[in-house]
Amino acid sequence: MAASVMLSSVTLKPAGFTVEKTAARGLPSLTRARPSFKIVASGVKKIKTDKPFGINGSMDLRDGVDASGRKGKGYGVYKYVDKYGANVDGYSPIYNENEWSASGDVYKGGVTGLAIWAVTLAGILAGGALLVYNTSALAQ
């Protein structure tokens, strides 16, 4: 009986949907302020290379067309040598022949470096084997 009295006194009324345009404290604003400084490029920076990186300038296309069906213009990778000082492979080459060591016969770390490398590798392998053994049924 008490429950029916409470239910009759509580009624739900639908409320209209309204949006208030008040700024909440602590929340960032969606409007952006204009920056006080301007970034200006200083010009074209040419890459200095003795010879361009990459393959030769000719392009060997099957039936004379590329993958999209367009006829090749024959630029190859050397199109930008005069403009930027290097071809498209010259912007971030993987290696530079001028930075190679004189010979690859001797490890620069010497015998001590090889010994440290071997001990480290053996320790990693032994530690892995120990972990496998300790978590297996053989350790029980």
From Swiss-Prot:
It is found in: Plastid, Chloroplast thylakoid membrane. The modification Phosphoserine is found at S58. Its main location: plastid. GO terms for molecular function: mRNA binding. GO terms for biological process: photosystem II oxygen evolving complex assembly. It holds the Pfam family PsbR. InterPro entries: PSII_PsbR. Residues 1-41 form a transit peptide. Keywords: Chloroplast, Membrane, Phosphoprotein, Photosynthesis, Photosystem II, Plastid, Thylakoid, Transit peptide. GO terms for cellular component: chloroplast; chloroplast thylakoid; chloroplast thylakoid membrane; mitochondrion; photosystem II oxygen evolving complex; thylakoid. Belongs to the psbR family. Associated with the oxygen-evolving complex of photosystem II. This is Photosystem II 10 kDa polypeptide, chloroplastic. It comes from Arabidopsis thaliana (Mouse-ear cress).
